[in-house]
From Swiss-Prot:
GO terms for molecular function: 6,7-dimethyl-8-ribityllumazine synthase activity. Keywords: Riboflavin biosynthesis, Transferase. It comes from the Bacteria. It comes from Geobacter sp. (strain M21). The keyword Zinc does not apply. Pathway: Cofactor biosynthesis; riboflavin biosynthesis; riboflavin from 2-hydroxy-3-oxobutyl phosphate and 5-amino-6-(D-ribitylamino)uracil: step 1/2. The lineage of its organism: Bacteria, Pseudomonadati, Thermodesulfobacteriota, Desulfuromonadia, Geobacterales. Belongs to the DMRL synthase family. This is 6,7-dimethyl-8-ribityllumazine synthase.
Length: 155
C-alpha cells in the first residue's frame, strides 16, 4: 500500500516571511491583507510572521533568497504588482522576478509562493487583489501553508 502525502491547511507552529514590493503599493497592501488573513485564519501566530517591504518587485527575489537561506522560515510569500506600461520594462522585470523567486525556492529548499501580479492594466491588478478575481495574496498564503506541511510530512 503506497504512502500518500498531502499537505494540511494548518499554519500552527510554522514561521512565515512575507516580502512585499512597495511600488504599486495600493495593490501590494491588498495582497498583504489577503495573505495575513489566510495565515491567521489557518492558525498562524502573528508573532511568527515577518513582513519585509522592499522598493519594488525587482528586489523581491534577492530578499526571498536571503530570508530562505537564513533558516528562520518554514515558508515565504512574495507579493507585489508589475503592471504593463508603454515600454519593454514590464517584460524584463516580470521575467526576472518570476525566475528569481523560483530560484530562491529551488536553491534553498524553502517553499516560496509567487504572489506577484503581472497584469496588463491597473484594473486587472485591482481585480486580483481582492475584488472580482479573489485575492492572490490569500491564494499564495494557502499554497505555502500546504507545501510547508507536505515538507514536514516528508522529513
Amino acid at each position: 500500500m503506497p504512502k500518500y502525502v498531502e499537505g494540511k491547511l494548518n499554519a500552527e507552529g510554522l514561521k512565515f516571511g512575507i516580502i512585499v514590493g512597495r511600488f504599486n503599493s495600493f495593490i501590494g497592501e491588498r495582497l498583504l491583507e489577503g495573505a495575513l488573513d489566510a495565515l491567521l485564519r489557518h492558525g498562524a501566530d502573528d508573532a511568527q510572521i515577518t513582513v519585509v517591504r522592499v522598493p519594488g518587485a525587482f528586489e523581491i527575489p534577492l530578499t526571498a533568497q536571503k530570508m530562505a537561506g537564513s533558516g528562520n522560515y518554514d515558508a515565504l510569500i512574495c507579493l507585489g504588482a508589475v503592471i504593463r506600461g508603454s515600454t519593454p520594462h514590464f517584460d524584463y522585470v516580470s521575467s526576472e522576478v518570476s525566475k528569481g523567486i523560483a530560484h530562491a525556492s529551488l536553491a534553498t529548499g524553502v517553499p516560496v509562493a509567487f504572489g506577484v501580479l503581472t497584469t496588463d492594466t491597473i484594473e486587472q491588478a485591482i481585480e486580483r487583489a481582492g475584488t472580482k478575481a479573489g485575492n492572490k495574496g490569500f491564494d499564495a498564503a494557502m499554497t505555502v501553508i500546504e507545501i510547508a506541511n507536505v515538507f514536514k510530512e516528508m522529513k
